[in-house]
């Protein structure tokens, strides 16, 4: 683990049939425009153009996705943990509710850092340590995931994990064909 990119890891842990089920269930509901949080003003706003759609998951969807997320996070911790009396073992114990993302033609996720505050509601407390992106399909063009200006190729069922801090700026490029379905969560 000598290079900063060593902490960007992809594991394929979501069954393809579960990915399809999640897409089908989400498309029976109403999507909303993504909003960016401005920590200075305390406001949430969407960009005027090219903003992707988002949707919270249901408790049932979260329960069905949990085994895949837990398996990926366990593997991540085994790979990136440093040996030592106080550094080994499990250091991630929870992850936030999933938020589904939908990038249709002409939309994107602009480059940003994951300095997420909104996942903590006063009852759930912690510091986001690992950003999680789950890829639910791959029958689209464009919508490439870039982290630190490098493309990370994702297949159906992949879970991408990386540290949730300013050293990992990331984005999803504009979708040019089809629709990209994914989800995000943060582990702490």
Language-model features: where?
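Fe(II)/2-oxoglutarate oxygenase catalytic core
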Residues: 1-159, 167-188
């Amino acid at each position: 683990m000598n290079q900063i990119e060593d902490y960007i890891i992809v594991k394929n842990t979501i069954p393809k049939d579960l990915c399809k089920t999640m897409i089908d269930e989400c498309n029976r509901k109403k999507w909303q425009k993504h909003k960016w949080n401005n920590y200075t003003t305390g406001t949430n706003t969407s960009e005027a153009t090219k903003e992707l759609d988002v949707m919270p998951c249901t408790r049932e969807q979260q329960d069905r996705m949990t085994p895949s997320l837990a398996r990926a996070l366990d593997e991540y911790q085994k790979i990136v943990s440093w040996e030592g009396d106080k550094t080994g073992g499990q250091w991630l114990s929870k992850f936030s509710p999933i938020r589904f993302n939908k990038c249709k033609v002409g939309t994107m996720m602009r480059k940003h850092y994951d300095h997420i505050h909104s996942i903590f509601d006063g009852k759930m407390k912690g510091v986001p340590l690992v950003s999680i992106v789950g890829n639910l399909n791959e029958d689209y063009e464009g919508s490439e995931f870039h982290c630190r200006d490098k493309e990370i190729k994702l297949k159906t069922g992949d879970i991408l994990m990386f540290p949730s801090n300013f050293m990992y700026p990331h984005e999803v490029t504009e979708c040019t064909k089809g629709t990209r379905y994914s989800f995000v969560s943060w582990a702490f």
